[in-house]
């Protein structure tokens, strides 16, 4: 049933019918390989983002004891995921899960972009006020003098939850006054966690876009206020892109080459598009045509799919095709794609597959039972990626058209959050997933 008025869009009628029915699908991007837009980040931009996180590692280790075992690096394990394979996908290459759900402090992929943007801001303010020079030890940013300086500044962000956690944890630790505008989709425990860190949480009855807009408007009227714009921030995007170097080192250590004979498939949950767009950009810069990035969106919130499939020239919302943007995947409940990441994904994403809430909870159960990983629903969205390629006509056509031998491929499924979720929430997720499986068995 359609929940919003439908706006005429240049969408294929068959695709539109599938979207409006809420049916999971795989859409292949015909624009992959087109030239990047002029505003695309440069190689120097990527290098500087990596250098910033490296020089600030000591600072992060000082601020957060959880990061000391990693020397302050924002890094997550790459876990073999062969137990996820079903009998019908047994020959589909080597599978891994990228465990950003286990990232310390923020507990999600958003630590990569969020920490990078806050660190860039802190460096800029401190350099302007003479607290640090270009080559100085960044641990000086944790000094009392720096804390007093940052306390005169505000950091503000709009979020469905995880980006707010990332920004809020680091900005407040450095001393910034921090304000997070949270949409109705945000979980109560995320709001509570921020408040215990002294973060001002502003709750909104509307969706993600309304929370972001409210934050943007408030920030515009405040002196010394930096707004982290999830819909268009280059600093967030570049922070996500740094994950490519980390993954490349892990794949090399695992003995998985990436080249014409050994393609890499990366499956990423997608909300507004910044995190998957940044990671795709970093991977494409490193591997070119040998990496194939597929993004996963809820059937109720396929904002990137709708944007790309409609041609990409003008902003398009899932509301324009009659969808309601309501899903248990709170981190992916976004109605309109990023105006920064969208055009970059248009040129670089291999495709988009959608997942309904029942599939999300089935994937959650698989992650728990087969890999011993507890995830939040959003983080499980990409687990169906390899199956779409092996088990659908569109997926098999994609492989055939590129001469890809499935057995030679490496699949990386990005798990984006879950380690900070309270135990009671995890029990609720698992109970729902188990009940759903029992119902499916009874109806079989």
Swiss-Prot record:
GO biological process, alphabetically ordered: D-serine catabolic process; isoleucine biosynthetic process
Keywords: Lyase, Pyridoxal phosphate
A Pfam family hit: PALP
Catalytic activity: D-serine = pyruvate + NH4(+)
A GO molecular function held by the record: pyridoxal phosphate binding
Domain of life: Bacteria
InterPro entries for this protein: D_Ser_am_lyase, Ser/Thr_Dehydratase, TrpB-like_PALP, TrpB-like_PALP_sf
Modified residues (N6-(pyridoxal phosphate)lysine): 110
Required co-factors: pyridoxal 5'-phosphate
Top-level EC class as recorded in UniProt: lyase
EC number: 4.3.1.18
NCBIfam families: D_Ser_am_lyase (TIGR02035), PRK02991.1 (NF002823)
HAMAP family, per database record: D_Ser_dehydrat
PANTHER family: D-SERINE DEHYDRATASE, THREONINE DEHYDRATASE, MITOCHONDRIAL-RELATED
Family per record: Belongs to the serine/threonine dehydratase family. DsdA subfamily.
The protein's name in its UniProt record: Probable D-serine dehydratase
Organism listed in the record: Burkholderia thailandensis (strain ATCC 700388 / DSM 13276 / CCUG 48851 / CIP 106301 / E264)
Gene: dsdA
């Amino acid at each position: 049933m359609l929940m919003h008025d439908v706006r005429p869009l240049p969408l294929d009628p068959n695709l539109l019918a599938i979207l409006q029915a809420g049916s999971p699908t795989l859409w292949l991007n015909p624009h992959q390989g087109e030239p990047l837009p002029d505003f695309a980040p440069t190689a120097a931009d990527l290098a500087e983002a990596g250098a910033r996180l490296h020089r600030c590692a000591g600072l992060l280790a000082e601020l957060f004891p959880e990061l000391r075992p990693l020397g302050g690096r924002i890094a997550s394990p790459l876990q073999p995921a062969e137990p996820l394979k079903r009998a019908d996908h047994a020959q589909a290459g080597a599978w891994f899960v990228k465990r950003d759900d286990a990232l310390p402090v923020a507990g999600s992929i958003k630590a990569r972009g969020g920490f990078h943007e806050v660190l860039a801001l802190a460096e800029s303010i401190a350099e302007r006020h003479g607290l640090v020079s270009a080559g100085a030890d960044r641990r000086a940013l944790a000094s009392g003098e720096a804390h007093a300086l940052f306390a005169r500044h505000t950091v503000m962000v709009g979020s469905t939850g995880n980006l707010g956690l990332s920004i809020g944890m680091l900005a407040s630790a450095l001393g910034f006054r921090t304000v997070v505008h949270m949409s109705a989709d945000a979980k109560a425990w995320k709001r509570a966690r921020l408040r215990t860190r002294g973060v001002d949480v502003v709750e909104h009855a509307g969706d993600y876009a309304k929370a972001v807009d409210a934050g943007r408007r408030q920030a515009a009227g405040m002196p010394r206020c930096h707004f982290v714009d999830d819909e268009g921030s280059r600093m967030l995007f570049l922070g996500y892109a740094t994950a490519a170097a980390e993954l490349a080192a892990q794949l090399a250590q695992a003995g998985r080459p990436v080249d014409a004979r050994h393609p890499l498939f990366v499956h990423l949950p997608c909300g507004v598009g910044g995190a998957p767009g940044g990671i795709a950009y970093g991977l494409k810069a490193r591997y070119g045509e040998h990496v194939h990035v597929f993004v996963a969106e809820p059937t109720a919130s396929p904002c990137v799919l709708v944007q790309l499939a409609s041609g990409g020239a003008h902003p398009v919302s899932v509301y324009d095709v009659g969808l309601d943007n309501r899903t248990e995947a709170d981190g992916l409940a976004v109605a309109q794609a990023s105006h920064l990441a969208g055009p970059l994904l248009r040129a670089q994403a291999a495709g988009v597959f959608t997942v309904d809430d029942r599939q999300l909870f089935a994937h959650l159960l698989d992650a728990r039972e087969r890999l011993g990983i507890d995830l939040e629903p959003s983080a499980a969205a990409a687990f169906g990626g390899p199956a779409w390629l092996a088990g659908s006509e569109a997926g098999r056509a994609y492989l055939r058209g590129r001469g890809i031998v499935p057995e030679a491929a490496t699949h990386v499924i990005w798990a984006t959050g879950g380690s900070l979720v309270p135990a009671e929430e995890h029990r609720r997720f698992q109970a729902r997933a188990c009940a759903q499986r029992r119902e499916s068995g009874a109806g079989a």
